[in-house]
């Protein structure tokens, strides 16, 4: 009878250990999934921020275009004054 009780308690303990292992495994999987989703979200937000920022080259190009436009207008004004 004692060995039968020991056998049941061992199998019960093994089942509990298996259940605990499964719970821990599922918890880790859920955490990994949540971290991956959060990382994707952060990367997407970072990409959107980068798209919103004007590129440094484009600012310089715009400034050069503005200066050229101003010079062209000044040249036309000078020509019109001469005529």
Curated annotation (Swiss-Prot):
One of its GO terms (molecular function) is actin binding. Keywords: Actin-binding, Calmodulin-binding, Cytoplasm, Cytoskeleton, Muscle protein, Phosphoprotein. This is Non-muscle caldesmon. It comes from the Eukaryota. Actin- and myosin-binding protein implicated in the regulation of actomyosin interactions in smooth muscle and nonmuscle cells (could act as a bridge between myosin and actin filaments). Stimulates actin binding of tropomyosin which increases the stabilization of actin filament structure. In muscle tissues, inhibits the actomyosin ATPase by binding to F-actin. This inhibition is attenuated by calcium-calmodulin and is potentiated by tropomyosin. Interacts with actin, myosin, two molecules of tropomyosin and with calmodulin. The keyword Endoplasmic reticulum does not apply. Disulfide bonds: none annotated. It comes from Bos taurus. One of its GO terms (cellular component) is myofibril. It is found in: Cytoplasm, Cytoskeleton; Cytoplasm, Myofibril; Cytoplasm, Cytoskeleton, Stress fiber. Residues 1-63 are annotated as: Myosin and calmodulin-binding. In non-muscle cells, phosphorylation by CDC2 during mitosis causes caldesmon to dissociate from microfilaments. Phosphorylation reduces caldesmon binding to actin, myosin, and calmodulin as well as its inhibition of actomyosin ATPase activity. Phosphorylation also occurs in both quiescent and dividing smooth muscle cells with similar effects on the interaction with actin and calmodulin and on microfilaments reorganization. Its main location: cytoplasm. Residues 1-83 are annotated as: Disordered. The lineage of its organism: Eukaryota, Metazoa, Chordata, Craniata, Vertebrata. The N-terminal part seems to be a myosin/calmodulin-binding domain, and the C-terminal a tropomyosin/actin/calmodulin-binding domain. These two domains are separated by a central helical region in the smooth-muscle form. Residues 1-44, 62-76 have a biased composition (Basic and acidic residues).
């Amino acid at each position: 009878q004692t060995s039968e009780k020991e056998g049941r308690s061992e199998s019960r303990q093994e089942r509990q250990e298996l259940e605990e292992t499964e719970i821990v495994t599922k918890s880790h999987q859920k955490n990994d999934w949540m971290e991956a989703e959060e990382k994707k979200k952060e990367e997407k937000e970072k990409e959107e921020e980068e798209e919103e920022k004007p590129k440094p080259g484009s600012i310089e190009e715009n400034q050069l275009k503005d200066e050229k436009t101003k010079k062209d207008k000044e040249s036309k004004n000078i020509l019109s004054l001469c005529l």
